[in-house]
Amino acid sequence: MAIRTLLLSWLVRLMSSTWRVRWTDQGPLEEALKTGPVIFACLHGDLLLVAGTHRAWSPTVMVSLSQDGSLLAGVLGHLGYGVLRGGSSKGGAAVLRGAVRQVEEGRSLLITVDGPRGPAGEPKAGALSLSRLSGAPVFWVRGRAERCWRAGSWDSFVVPWFFSRVHMQCGRLAGTADEDGEERRQRLARVLA
């Protein structure tokens, strides 16, 4: 597994170095990062796009305890990301405590809000709960690659081709951490759609 994660991380690093990335609305994120950590929220299918374009901000990534999660954790570790293992179905309370600790220590977090099992595009409450407990703002992130391969998996995982144009967009989730969780979760689903 160690050789496989090393090779995959090398491939991701090589591929993402050839992408022609264009950001929209990045200013508010950069301002927020000057004042403290943020919670990045993306869809599971966009994880490679986000991981390939967020290394400069080096967030800790929440990764499930599954076997696929072990492979992903190894790849992300080789790419220089911190990794926090656990998820909504296994280790949820412990990973939430660990995530709050990461934010208190000044580290931003990256959460795939519809993972690890879906349904695709339907955010769970984890990122919003973490925002409420830690006080860190939620920034949604989405991407689109002009040329890519989409996996036949539940999340239609996106793998941009070498030299693809990648369009990234992010924004602060409107509202406050104290407002109704369901309303905020639906707002997150709309901006990530």
Where are these regions (language model features)?
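Short, structured coil/loop segments at alpha-helix boundaries
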Residues: 1, 26-27, 35, 66, ...
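A short, well-structured juxtamembrane/interface segment
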Residues: 10-37, 43-49
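Conserved beta-strand termini and adjacent loop/short-helix elements that scaffold enzyme active sites
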Residues: 24-26, 64, 86-89, 171-173
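Catalytic core of membrane glycerolipid acyltransferases/transacylases, capturing the structured
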Residues: 35-90, 134, 149-151
